[in-house]
Amino acid sequence: MPIITRLPDSVANKISAGEVVQRPASVVKELLENAIDAGATKISVTIKDAGKELIRIADNGVGMNRDDALLCVERFATSKIKSADDLDALHTLGFRGEALASICSVSHFELKTRQADATLGLLFRYDGGSLVEELEVQAEQGTSFSVRNLFYNVPARRKFLKSNATEYHHLFEIVKSFTLAYPEIEWRMVNDDEELFNFKNNDVLERLNFYYGDDFASSLIEVAEQNDYLPIHGYLGKPALQKKRKLEQYFFINRRLVQNRMLLQAVQQAYGDLLVERQTPFVLLFLTIDPSRIDVNVHPAKLEIRFDDERQVRSMFYPVIKRAVQLHDFSTNISVIEPFASASEPFVGSSSQPIFSSTSSQAPRMGGGSRRFDLSDAPERAITKNELYRNYREGAFSSPSVASYDAPSPLQQGGLFALASAEESLFGAQAVHEASENIEAFQLSPLDNIVEHKEVEPKIWQLHNKYLICQIKTGLMIIDQHVAHERVLYERALEVMQQNVPNAQQLLFPQKVEFRAWEYEVFEEIRDDLYRLGFNVRLFGNRTVMIEGVPQDVKSGSEVTILQDMITQYQENATKLKLERRDNLAKSYSCRNAIMTGQKLSMEEMRSLIDNLFATREPYTCPHGRPIIIKLSLDQLDKMFGRK
């Protein structure tokens, strides 16, 4: 007697449904793909009870005749491909012919359809995959799928569905991704009898503003790259829009939403230090590639893809993202996000909400006529580092018709990272003697192009010995002095180590350091790079060393503390962040050696710090991703004071 038997189709469909239909969001995705493949220009999504009670997708596509309508719910029935070779030339979202059969088998399923030349439409009702009713009915052109009581006949699957809030979140994210990928389609969504949106225009930026807030689109970097192999277009978020949710990173390949680790890592690396630890930037990118170069038949959900030559794709993708990131000003703006209160209403009201708060992509609006300001990075326009520096230099003049300034380059400064002698640099002993008393804790390299006449210098104030407030041509610029100096020291340290020329000043009296066992192990690991950085250290007994020279920007008397703190910071970074050795060392050095909050600076020190900051590659964030610069425009001030 045979033991192996062929499963009935009803059982097989339920089993395959476990792969294709994992939750209500899976149903929505499959049905939306069918609607788009049918050439729809209008699609409506109706949901009840987070999709557990009802999912209805209606479109105005081509519709189906009776034979196709009956066949579409059979396994492996599809109009998308005819042979395996067609998989190499896919121009549709669906292709397997499994989804409708799987959905139909685990729900009360209804299909209504009418073609353009038909007088009446057709209605088919299924219970658990079995046809129970067929009717001719009045219907609009196109197709409507209604899925009721999902998993009603698979209680184990229904039991493992999450809360309505969770299931609705997944479902809404799927719908949102399609509305962004297909702006030419009119989209309408209704949840529990409440209309959520009804998009009739084809502006993807307006849709982004709807989802994330009115100023969101102005905070994006546009990406556009045309080539024969991998055209790329879309938008990238500025660092202040960082979110931990990966659903806010949308990669569409041939307009199919995909997940690909290489693309994620390439974007992350392109942003580099602009990102705060464990955060990711907002991404909405569309990539077009020959269908024969990708494999979308990797997983039943069709979210994963493989490239035939991933290395080549990355070599073309990464430079585009890196270039887009480098060409934009990432300084933070303070922007007004609520209209000004009317004269009859209080300015702030009784709300306990702070007037200034961090940006949130889903921040609730404040009612009662109250007004709220937001720390966002929405600029009036995207500007470059040089333009921001000119804005700062021209802030000293009341008239805009003044000579332009370019951001200082390393060459203009005699080398920002140049290995100047003690007599040539403010880091030298002679300069320390001649400088003001306020310069004891740090020194910065002089600039060859500092303007000689004080009356044309930018106006700078130090606030609470923590922030530098600068008048710029368009308003105000606020700089965190600690992280600004940290950025300068970080890039200088990397350059010095790469040049492999020790940048040390010898100590008159060598300093002894006794390490603990683990500290000495770390010291041995980074000993060569410490020497390149400028630490001239000689072994002196068991786990003991003598510091005979240090980098020129190490404060006298802090040599031992700096070295010990660096080693501690290095170990912490190695454990948490998995950084490359020199990058880790540069971060540790700059963090421990930068000027501190509470330290008073002279006017010359403040000017030198700002000029050195704008000579760096990334003046907007510290090596750990914290913002350095915040801007407040005159226009924003006028709005805050009700002048506009």
Swiss-Prot record:
It comes from the Bacteria. Transmembrane segments: none annotated. Pfam families: DNA_mis_repair, HATPase_c_3, MutL_C. One of its GO terms (molecular function) is mismatched DNA binding. PROSITE patterns: DNA_MISMATCH_REPAIR_1. Keywords: DNA damage, DNA repair. GO terms for biological process: mismatch repair. Coiled coil: none annotated. GO terms for cellular component: mismatch repair complex. CDD domains: HATPase_MutL-MLH-PMS-like (cd16926), MutL_Trans (cd00782). Belongs to the DNA mismatch repair MutL/HexB family. This protein is involved in the repair of mismatches in DNA. It is required for dam-dependent methyl-directed DNA mismatch repair. May act as a 'molecular matchmaker', a protein that promotes the formation of a stable complex between two or more DNA-binding proteins in an ATP-dependent manner without itself being part of a final effector complex. This is DNA mismatch repair protein MutL. It comes from Chlorobium chlorochromatii (strain CaD3).
